[in-house]
Amino acid sequence: MKIYLVGGAVRDALLGLPVKDRDWVVVGSTPQEMLDAGYQQVGRDFPVFLHPQTHEEYALARTERKSGSGYTGFTCYAAPDVTLEDDLKRRDLTINALAQDDNGEIIDPYNGLGDLQNRLLRHVSPAFGEDPLRVLRVARFAARYAHLGFRIADETLTLMREMTHAGELEHLTPERVWKETESALTTRNPQVFFQVLRDCGALRVLFPEIDALFGVPAPARWHPEIDTGIHTLMTLSMAAMLSPQVDVRFATLCHDLGKGLTPPELWPRHHGHGPAGVKLVEQLCQRLRVPNEIRDLARLVAEFHDLIHTFPMLNPKTIVKLFDSIDAWRKPQRVEQLALTSEADVRGRTGFESADYPQGRWLREAWEVAQSVPTKAVVEAGFKGVEIREELTRRRIAAIASWKEQRCPKPD
């Protein structure tokens, strides 16, 4: 029996990155031998065991053979005669097909070290094309390591295109697509994930609402980048700088979906694109089974981001109504989330990356003013039932009117 550290732990250690999870491959052993040594078996489809002390995963070396459609249609073979090289060959990328023995020596049968040095994401073998999930995984790795200068090898991107055009991605379940997307949204450069999907044709298959934005022009006065798809990825990049929250980043990604519905004869203007985009947000989220909390914020951002841009022109009554509409009284975090997504929208434009966004400050200040109106004072004044809410609204409007007179500049 020989045990090797494999995959991501080896890769990230070589890149000088923190190692989170460690996975091990066991060569020359059997399930019974592992059980006798005190390991606990957890793999149902193939032999994976938990170490009795560390609870890290130890898998018997195995090979995989395509036996059906999609990413689950594989038959696994695990036996003492499966070599380490056999096991590593089934991995997706060469940089993930590295192993380390107990002496610290790196085993590299597929030039993963060379690709690490050259910052290349390259598939190990043609078997890559048998698993459509790998298209998403490579896009996610491209986003995860973009800041280190990694790019996808030309031959790998070609294979990803071939897989997409062959309809392989249609076998992916919504849950797996969302899981990979959510993970990509946590990276430093989530926009790279969607750009890679577009480069290989997968964006049109998995995110048609986003793909439809490319080639749709916006007024050059407000959008020097012109193309709404490019603007969308720029705003996502900006959102990633402003917030680590997946819901803020996803909502920013979806903020302009309604522009994809504008008839070409009306271009480059997109009047009413915000409310129009709400249905597309719901459609996308339902298809991918996006969690409700993330979906709800995306809907609100699509509907209200343009309103927040015009904050100096809003009357106090409209501002209070906005807080009501986003359910800020029960979910106050939404005020900050809308401020961030709206800022990402403004700064996600060519030449505006460092622009100030005072509307965000005013929105936050107005919220603090509205919040400071005490409910207790309304009740003590003798108001009852529905009168309490009506009077509370009147006082909030008055408080914001007073604040706005002093703090928020009047529109020209």
Swiss-Prot record:
It catalyses: a tRNA precursor + 2 CTP + ATP = a tRNA with a 3' CCA end + 3 diphosphate; a tRNA with a 3' CCA end + 2 CTP + ATP = a tRNA with a 3' CCACCA end + 3 diphosphate. Keywords: ATP-binding, Hydrolase, Magnesium, Metal-binding, Multifunctional enzyme, Nickel, Nucleotide-binding, Nucleotidyltransferase, RNA repair, RNA-binding, Transferase, tRNA processing. The keyword Cell cycle does not apply. Magnesium is required for nucleotidyltransferase activity. SUPFAM superfamilies: Nucleotidyltransferase, Poly A polymerase C-terminal region-like. InterPro entries: CCA_bact, HD/PDEase_dom, HD_domain, NT_sf, PolA_pol_head_dom, PolyA_RNA-bd, tRNA_CCA-adding_enzyme. Its cofactor is Mg(2+); Ni(2+). It comes from the Bacteria. Comprises two domains: an N-terminal domain containing the nucleotidyltransferase activity and a C-terminal HD domain associated with both phosphodiesterase and phosphatase activities. Catalyzes the addition and repair of the essential 3'-terminal CCA sequence in tRNAs without using a nucleic acid template. Adds these three nucleotides in the order of C, C, and A to the tRNA nucleotide-73, using CTP and ATP as substrates and producing inorganic pyrophosphate. tRNA 3'-terminal CCA addition is required both for tRNA processing and repair. Also involved in tRNA surveillance by mediating tandem CCA addition to generate a CCACCA at the 3' terminus of unstable tRNAs. While stable tRNAs receive only 3'-terminal CCA, unstable tRNAs are marked with CCACCA and rapidly degraded. Belongs to the tRNA nucleotidyltransferase/poly(A) polymerase family. Bacterial CCA-adding enzyme type 1 subfamily. Monomer. Can also form homodimers and oligomers. This is Multifunctional CCA protein. It comes from Escherichia coli O139:H28 (strain E24377A / ETEC). The lineage of its organism: Bacteria, Pseudomonadati, Pseudomonadota, Gammaproteobacteria, Enterobacterales.
